[in-house]
């Protein structure tokens, strides 16, 4: 996926997190089929950011960090979590 689009999608997801008090789920689907997806849940203390120098999204969880290369990303979805 185009790095500029990825950056805009992540910036929009950050705005949604602020608007809905971190109650969103972000799903990133890669190029490996249906089983190759990553879910980010900010309300579970999972962080995310776009690093332009690495051309990747960095997902931070309690067990460590995951790097997702923007070239492998096919879709990014944001969902509002129901309370």
Q: Where are each of the predicted segments found?
A:
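A general, composition-driven signal for non-globular sequence regions
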Residues: 1-2, 59, 74
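Short acidic, Gly/Pro-enriched loop/turn segments at secondary-structure junctions
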Residues: 62-63, 77-83
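Phosphoinositide-dependent membrane-docking surfaces
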Residues: 69-78
